Regions:
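Catalytic metal-binding acidic patch
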Residues: 34, 39-58
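Short hydrophobic/aromatic patches at helix-to-coil boundaries
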Residues: 94-100
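Metal-dependent nucleotidyltransferase catalytic core
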Residues: 4-5, 11, 53-83
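Short, charged recognition helix plus adjacent turn
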Residues: 88-92
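Helical scaffold of the NTase/Pol beta-like nucleotidyltransferase catalytic core
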Residues: 1-30
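Conserved beta-strand core positions
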Residues: 30, 47-49, 77
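Short connector loops at helix/strand junctions that flank enzyme active sites
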Residues: 25, 44-46, 72
């Protein structure tokens, strides 16, 4: 039950930032996947986020976004660009992803 509450709270925080993320970082869509979605996270787990961009950011802007989300949520965030998904693992991730 606590896992579901944590996931819901994370989703609410992220959803509340979508306009800012779109404006400042050109984020088109954001979704969660991985251990948090499967309710298998531990205290050392990071939060896996799948991101698609309207305009591809440079490396520094990408890292800035990852750090911003980590600070916002208080959880280490691992950003994965949807555009860079490998076919085999990409299918699994896309089946699991929970849109924000």
């Amino acid at each position: 039950m606590e896992d579901r509450i944590a996931l819901t709270n994370i989703k609410k925080k992220l959803h509340g930032q979508l306009a800012l993320l779109s404006e400042q970082y050109q984020v088109k869509s954001l979704g969660m996947f991985g251990s948090y979605v499967r309710h298998e996270q531990s205290t050392s787990s990071d939060l896996d986020l799948l991101v698609a961009f309207n305009e591809m950011p440079g490396l520094l802007k990408f890292i800035e976004l990852e750090n911003y989300l980590t600070d916002l949520l208080g959880i280490k965030v691992d950003l994965v660009m949807q555009e860079n998904l490998k076919p085999r693992i990409g299918k699994r991730i896309l089946r699991e992803v929970v849109p924000v």
